[in-house]
Amino acid sequence: MNNMYFSLLFLLFVLCSSCDISNPDTNSKPYPIVDIDGNGYDSVQIGNQFWLNSNFKVTHFRNGDPIPEAKTALEWIEASEQGKPAYCYYDNNPFNALLYGKLYNWYAITDPRGLAPLGWHIPTDEELIQLGNDVNNDGGSIKSNSGWQNGANGTNTSRFYALPGGFRSYNGSFSFIEYFGYWWSSSASNNENAWGRYLNSEGNYVYRYMYKKGCGFAIRCIKDS
């Protein structure tokens, strides 16, 4: 009788141990997040927001249509002048995308076909303002702790891993890799410009500025609320 009793207790223990009876966390991080090309991303919570903690690398819109790649300065300029989406690699070198992701003009990130995975979107200017507030505008806390020139590496205490991937001007030229990092918001400031953010190797501040929509910046995605 005692053997049967202890056997039943053991079985009950095993069954209970295999069940997760804790309350579900509605803000839990979905690992990994996968874009339409199969690239995987991790996320990090900063304040009440969830962010991808690496730059985007996708080459297709969410419906499967390819994002046009601008392989020459002329192609980049034409996309800018015509208000058409485009992406590129820094210096037209695919190797740079392995670390820094790809550079997109603003027309690509606001195209109605969508870039972000389902449940995610390109941040608005207001959401980037909130990110800055959440880290007290301390750029060092969102900078990666390696890769920045002039001894300007960050602490990365937020685990955002902001990297100095440089940018592409609307005129097709590339600048500032290893010295500056630039990210788009989805918010236009006027007909020609849109809001973005940059970090640099000369200080630890989150800078807000408006840029020509034809410029090529990195993008991060934020989770839908």
Q: Which residues does each PLM region occupy?
A:
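Sec-dependent signal peptide recognition
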Residues: 2-10
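C-terminal motif of bacterial Sec signal peptides marking the signal peptidase cleavage site
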Residues: 15-18
